[in-house]
Amino acid sequence: MACLFVASCSNDIIDKKEYPNWKATNEAFFSKTLSQAKTSISKGDKAWKIFRNWTLPGLDTNYKVADNEQVVVKVLKSGSETQHPLSTDSVLVAYRARLLPSTTYPNGWAFMQTYIGGYNAKTNGSIILPVVGTIISNKNTRVALPEGYSTAIQQMVVGDRWEVYVPANLGFASSAIASIGIPEYSTIIYDITLLEINPKKSIR
């Protein structure tokens, strides 16, 4: 099992030429994706889901959750299990985390991934990650996993493959961005397949 952290070759990763109008581009993209998901869900489309930040307290029905406190999910494959991971668990996943398209990366820079090239369930690598906790960055420092990742993974079951859209607010904390090498204000797009749940074996 291996997780690949793809490091930038230079400081160009934060160059405005690489990521022009990055804040506005990312905010507009997530807003459009959220709107699309809401429209699809209202029409009965089961391929789209929206989840509020798991760290928010219990809310009454009159509370309006801010757009940037939600993650959007597009279901690529549904598993048949019923158990969901808890915040204290760890999980075995195959995944890729990428940014929106930029000047050099037309498909978005994949800055964390367990496989190279196209998705292949038979050959993909995998890694054990905490549901809530930290990981080692490509600069060998510990960084907290995004709340958006933790929010989505707790809603999955084994066999699910989801594309998860995480707004910058629920992405990596400002203190972690430099360690990972991604620019601020980045929407993160995860392709996650949940392979196994390890109850109460959280990796911190």
Task: Show the residue positions of the predicted features.
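Cross-family detector of peptidyl-prolyl cis-trans isomerase
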Residues: C9-R204
